[in-house]
């Protein structure tokens, strides 16, 4: 498990994606935003979004396998990951779910989980007939040793990669290859 956690952190720190945008970094936290157009109606985009195991890159997981990841898209639901030893990881908690339009979760992904942070990630699916747009924002605040200047761009890269994989899944039936 330590090997996977180390690989997860290394990937998180070095992944970069062109579609990523760091909106703001301050001593108190950071804000990330991304947007893509997809060739699907909002209901199909929602179905793909909540089937996280089909598009998340397993290199950015503790188990090393995206098939172990799930999102229970209802208030109180979990963005969770099963571990081989019978354990698991609660990456985020669903606090708002409006099918086909908004999914909001709170928590810290990866190494952010072990720091004194609060995070809010919002996925919006916006009709853009005949298809849709997907917007994701992630706001993180609190205390992090060393500050946010290095970690925010890395988290941004990983989030951008995941959004690109989701877009590829929706548009082509297959997630984009890992970078």
Summary of predicted features, one role per range:
Residues 110-160:
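Beta-strand/loop substructures that line and gate deep hydrophobic ligand-binding cavities in soluble
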Residues 34-36, 90-96, 119-127:
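Hydrophobic/aromatic beta-strand elements that line small-molecule binding cavities or substrate pockets
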Residues 168-179:
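Short, highly charged C-terminal tails/helix-capping segments
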Residues 45-48, 79, 94, 105, ...:
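Hydrophobic pocket/interface hotspot
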Residues 52-91, 100:
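Short beta-edge strand/loop motif at the mouth of beta-sheet-based domains
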Residues 1-4:
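Positively charged n-region of N-terminal signal peptides that target proteins for export
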Residues 6-17:
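Bacterial N-terminal signal peptides
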Residues 18-66:
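Hydrophobic ligand-binding cavity/cleft-lining segments
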């Amino acid at each position: 498990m330590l090997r996977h956690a180390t690989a997860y952190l290394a990937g998180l720190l070095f992944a970069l994606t062109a579609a990523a945008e760091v909106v703001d970094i301050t001593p108190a936290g950071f804000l990330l935003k991304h947007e893509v157009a997809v060739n699907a109606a909002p209901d199909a985009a929602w179905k793909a979004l909540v089937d996280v195991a089909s598009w998340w890159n397993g290199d950015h997981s503790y188990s090393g396998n995206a098939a172990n990841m799930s999102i229970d898209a209802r208030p109180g639901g979990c963005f969770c990951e099963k571990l081989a030893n019978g354990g698991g990881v609660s990456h985020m908690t669903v606090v708002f779910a409006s099918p086909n339009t908004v999914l909001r979760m709170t928590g810290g992904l990866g190494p952010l989980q072990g720091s004194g942070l609060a995070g809010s990630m919002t996925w919006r699916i916006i009709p853009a007939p005949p298809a849709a747009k997907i917007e994701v924002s992630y706001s993180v605040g609190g205390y992090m040793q060393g500050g946010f200047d290095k970690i925010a761009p890395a988290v941004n890269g990983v989030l951008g990669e995941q959004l690109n994989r989701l877009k590829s899944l929706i548009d082509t039936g297959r997630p984009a290859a890992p970078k």
